[in-house]
Curated annotation (Swiss-Prot):
Known role: Part of a two-component P450 system that efficiently O-demethylates diverse aromatic substrates such as guaiacol and a wide variety of lignin-derived monomers. Is likely involved in lignin degradation, allowing Amycolatopsis sp. ATCC 39116 to catabolize plant biomass. GcoB transfers electrons from NADH to the cytochrome P450 subunit GcoA. Highly prefers NADH over NADPH as the electron donor.
Binding site for [2Fe-2S] cluster: 35, 40, 43, 75
Keyword flag Heme: no
Protein name in the entry: Aromatic O-demethylase, reductase subunit
Cofactor(s) needed for function: FAD; [2Fe-2S] cluster
SUPFAM superfamilies reported for this sequence: 2Fe-2S ferredoxin-like (SSF54292), Ferredoxin reductase-like, C-terminal NADP-linked domain (SSF52343), Riboflavin synthase domain-like (SSF63380)
Length: 334
């Protein structure tokens, strides 16, 4: 049965089986979201009227007390009646609608140790913001896996994904690293996620630091390129934390960006396998060494939870404003 759901004065229809988050995003109504698995709590909202089924919302993300008080996770909750909710102050603004996509694989290339670049071609342009992600449907399993977009929004008919092999992973070992080839069809949904730049009229052109761990580099590439397109002379530091030199990729691309934009600097940092050509240690520590004060800077973090948390501490240590800190944790698939 279809129910009407509303937030911030905007109303959409929620079709059978859809979560509140999916209904709002498909209707072009923005709702804070990140993991889409119920683990991060970004999409937590207040149910003002109506009733919802909380689905698979984990207890550690949405406690029994919170459920009793009317809180819900938009990515897990499904309405059981017409429902009105309250979210953040910006919820309800128009955004890029969530879409079902059928893409054609244009290229599959090994670019680093256990890392592949996958290029997907679309018949119709996809409106998105650099830094958002798409969900791929794993053939034959019904499983869905999330991959950040590495390209910019003007490249709207090609989706660039950076994929790291997960031993035993249903998506990587069973598909993306074993059998996926140019010409294959891929089913996906997108765009999703809040990890992107503010609108151009809210972007002050100030200095930025972006820290990515492993393939957490992917969304940062699109964000950095978009930021430089808006303000070509801005200072942008992009740190890539990996285990060893064999895990680095796209060094030529970053050299070209640096040549075009003198304020851009790419800093690889190796944690486990020392190499005299690169810095050792952790990218979050490298930032602390390089930037005496983070006042006026904005910070972007993407990668494993431990790295992201270390980055938040590093930014705060350098007195970066909390409202300028943006993060995207790579969490295990549920």
């Amino acid at each position: 049965m279809t129910f009407a759901v509303s937030v911030g004065g905007r109303r959409v229809d929620c079709e059978p089986g859809q979560t509140l988050l999916e209904a709002f995003l498909r209707g072009g109504v923005w709702m804070p979201n990140s993991c889409n698995q119920g683990t991060c709590g970004t999409c937590k909202l207040q149910v003002l009227s109506g009733e919802v089924d909380h689905g698979g919302a984990p207890e550690d993300t949405l406690s029994a007390e919170e459920r009793a008080s009317g809180l819900a996770l938009a990515c897990q909750a499904r309405p059981l009646a017409d429902t009105e909710v309250r979210s953040t102050a910006d919820a309800g603004r128009v955004t890029h609608p969530l879409r079902d996509l059928t893409a054609t694989v244009l290229e599959v290339a090994d670019i680093a140790r256990d890392t592949r670049r996958v290029l997907l071609g679309l018949a119709e342009p996809l409106a998105f913001e650099a830094g958002q992600y798409v969900e791929l449907v794993v053939p034959g399993s019904g499983a869905r896996r999330q991959y950040s977009l590495a390209n910019t929004a003007d490249e709207d008919k090609v989706l660039e994904l950076h994929v790291r092999r997960v031993p035993g992973g249903v998506a990587t070992d069973g598909w993306l690293f074993d059998g996926l080839a140019a010409g294959d069809r891929v089913e996906a949904t997108g765009p999703l996620g809040d990890f992107h730049l503010p609108p151009p009229d809210e972007d002050d052109g100030g200095p930025m630091v972006l820290i990515g761990g492993g393939t957490g580099l992917a969304p940062l590439v699109g964000i950095a390129r978009t930021a430089l397109a808006r303000h070509p002379s801005r200072e942008v530091l992009l740190y890539h934390g990996v285990r060893g030199a064999a895990d680095l990729y796209d060094l030529g691309r970053f050299a070209e960006i640096a040549e075009e934009h003198p304020g851009f600097r790419f800093v690889p940092v190796l944690s486990d396998e020392p190499d005299p050509a690169y810095r050792g240690g952790f990218p979050t520590d490298a930032f602390v060494e390089d930037v005496p004060s983070g006042r006026g800077w904005s910070g972007w973090l993407c990668g494993p939870p431990a790295m992201v948390e270390a980055g938040v501490k590093a930014f705060k240590r350098r007195r970066m404003s909390p409202r300028r800190i943006h993060r995207e944790k790579f969490t295990p698939a549920s």
